[in-house]
Amino acid sequence: MILLIDNYDSFTWNLYQYFCELGAEVLVRRNDELTLADIISLAPAKIVISPGPCTPDESGISLAAIRHFSGQTPILGVCLGHQAIAQVFGAAIVRAAKVMHGKTSPVSHTGQGVFLGLNNPLTVTRYHSLLIDPRTLPECFEVTARSEEGEIMGIRHRVFDLEGVQFHPESILSEQGHQLLANFLNR
């Protein structure tokens, strides 16, 4: 079972739908309606941290879940979830030079992890005003995708099964979103 932590974002249900279409059993819980003990009892096979309208500091149980389950359970962070992963490991989250809300842009990627077998560059949909400050991303992460402007669009932990994407693979305008999520499911 995938635990999908909902950070009060409507895109959470698009993620839910995509994962269900891929054959996954998905349990959705809001970030303030479960504790770390609840998650431990649920024993999810994978965890997805959803997008959200806030900063990682306001993402409820998300930060604690990332801290606790990193290295034990595969975790994918989407948008806010991506930022939360980076912040847990010490990166700073900063305002983007250009706000991207509902805009598509190409990202170039390494072809690893969730990007395995995807078009390169890949057209994705972005909804964010915050980004990972690249100067603060710890060495334990590799950057797996960047925008044309060089902004971090994907990260992957070098040891743990822990990955994040700044964009929304679950948006209808994102290219190969199902395949990206299938890559997370099928490893």
Swiss-Prot record:
This is Aminodeoxychorismate synthase component 2. It is an enzyme of class 2 (transferase). Residues 1-187 form the Glutamine amidotransferase type-1 domain. Pathway: Cofactor biosynthesis; tetrahydrofolate biosynthesis; 4-aminobenzoate from chorismate: step 1/2. It catalyses: chorismate + L-glutamine = 4-amino-4-deoxychorismate + L-glutamate. Its EC number is 2.6.1.85. SUPFAM superfamilies: Class I glutamine amidotransferase-like. GO terms for cellular component: cytosol. Part of a heterodimeric complex that catalyzes the two-step biosynthesis of 4-amino-4-deoxychorismate (ADC), a precursor of p-aminobenzoate (PABA) and tetrahydrofolate. In the first step, a glutamine amidotransferase (PabA) generates ammonia as a substrate that, along with chorismate, is used in the second step, catalyzed by aminodeoxychorismate synthase (PabB) to produce ADC. PabA converts glutamine into glutamate only in the presence of stoichiometric amounts of PabB. InterPro entries: Anth_synth/Amidotransfase (IPR050472), Class_I_gatase-like (IPR029062), GATASE (IPR017926), TrpG/PapA_dom (IPR006221). One of its GO terms (biological process) is folic acid biosynthetic process. Monomer. Heterodimer consisting of two non-identical subunits: a glutamine amidotransferase subunit (PabA) and a aminodeoxychorismate synthase subunit (PabB). It comes from the Bacteria. The gene is pabA. Pfam families: GATase. Keywords: Folate biosynthesis, Glutamine amidotransferase, Transferase. It comes from Klebsiella aerogenes (Enterobacter aerogenes). The active site is at C79, H168, E170. One of its GO terms (molecular function) is anthranilate synthase activity.
